[in-house]
């Protein structure tokens, strides 16, 4: 199954924010277990579908790591609760590596499972399905991913890995598949023209990042996709899907020796080549408001400025600070003032998205068009007041408790752990990063959180994009515990 979407605004949770806010402490290192597969009772599990959503019980994590001969970094956690394993290979092959051809990274990733020697897309899908295995792929701004979930029994594991290695390392890029996927992407671009949220997001990144590689959509554009050739896809794959440019994460019912063999097989099956350099750091954009006229009853509001990269030591303080501002659900500053007291929106959130280089800090909401200007000023005032006053001790204590409660719950599945390992490896974080993050977060003071938020954010530096109709404006309702205007229903689009 392919993930052919533009990156999520969180990473952009994306995925990556979850590494900090919803992950478990790494346990103290313990000796690697010897292979005890012969001692385990025989399992009758024949397909991943039989798991029916069940997750392994809570386990301690012992992150083992090494490098393959080709230069791939490997992170492995042995987890014997279920007879299965998860493999995630992360490449520095996202749209920031597109160069002058926006969309080449996304198209390359989307084409991985369209053909290998002797198999078309249908045969590949049937091959994985017949083994009870799942293949996944996705392309984002920093990274591209290929993943496999398989039963760990040798008769299922080995053919699934063989097929995965061919798909990731030796795709044939069939011409008919390229035409089909281009048409799908072009249809998606047309749909996005009717989606004010998509319009706002694309405009925001363009304004915020200017000429930087993060500026263009990770899927490319309608203008760029049409001209991409098979030769360009093959060249990008040969450059970006190399062993030296890969991080291999493994979690599951495997011994260290089995994990080493899997990593070696996958790494050796990739093109040979070094790691690609990260993009340069972006420069601060000019603050200001851009309005895009769109016929709708609501106006989308997006506010942003440059935040931090994954290596920034202020991330624990910013994470907690944002949780209080707008990163949680009900009870955050933004939700309390904008929704709960005034009923202006269905939801409002803020997020830091740390990336290889400075990712965005964003605030996102939509409201009735006739209240959009007042709502925008209210949001700006809330941010300015929060930066001036900082969080209260009660807010910080509550955020710490929420964080502490989320950590032990996040290791319930191999899939969540393998994603965390992939991020640790890709962003070159220490193996103790999870434990360090938790300890540092719990030790933070109100003054430290306030200082970090003010160091990295300014209410005067916001890049703002609004998408909606131009209509006469009305004053905002006064705040109350029971707003007369209830929050809007399901948001448009």
Model-inferred region functions:
Residues 77, 82-112, 121-168, 182, ...:
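M16 family metallopeptidases and their MPP-like homologs
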Residues 115-118, 168-176:
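Short, polar/flexible loop-turn hinges at active-site or ligand-entry regions and domain interfaces
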Residues 125, 179, 226, 234, ...:
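Generic structural signal for individual residues within well-ordered alpha-helical segments
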